[in-house]
Amino acid sequence: LKCYGIFRKIMTCPQGQNICEKFAYSPMHNGWMYSWGCTSNCHKGPLDKCCSTDLCNY
């Protein structure tokens, strides 16, 4: 599965990894924080976006 984010043109990942959506809990943001990052375990989430965690499915 190859999927890319909107930053694919300005962000490069190591070989075998893709740019994916990531969600992480951030107390500073008082909740879930959305970000992008490189990961090798992508799966296709909503709107054909690349996700790195199951949280992307909601």
Swiss-Prot record:
A family per Pfam: Toxin_cobra-type
Keywords: Acetylcholine receptor inhibiting toxin, Disulfide bond, Ion channel impairing toxin, Neurotoxin, Postsynaptic neurotoxin, Secreted, Toxin
Reported tissue expression: Expressed by the venom gland.
Compartments in which it is found: Secreted
Keyword Disulfide bond: yes
GO cellular component, one term: extracellular region
Secreted among keywords: yes
GO terms (BP aspect): modulation of receptor activity in another organism
Predominant subcellular localization, coarse grouping: secreted
Gene3D superfamilies, per the entry: CD59
One MF term in the entry's GO annotations: ion channel regulator activity
InterPro entries: Snake_3FTx (IPR003571), Snake_toxin-like_sf (IPR045860), Toxin_cobra-type (IPR054131)
Disulfide partners: 3-20, 13-38, 42-50, 51-56
Protein role: Produces peripheral paralysis by blocking neuromuscular transmission at the postsynaptic site. Binds to and inhibits the endogenous nicotinic acetylcholine receptors (nAChR) in the human rhabdomyosarcoma TE 671 cell line with an IC(50) of 266 mM. Not toxic to mice by intraperitoneal injection or to zebrafish by injection at the back dorsolateral region.
Protein family: Belongs to the three-finger toxin family. Short-chain subfamily.
Name this protein carries in UniProt: Short neurotoxin MS11
Organism name: Micrurus surinamensis
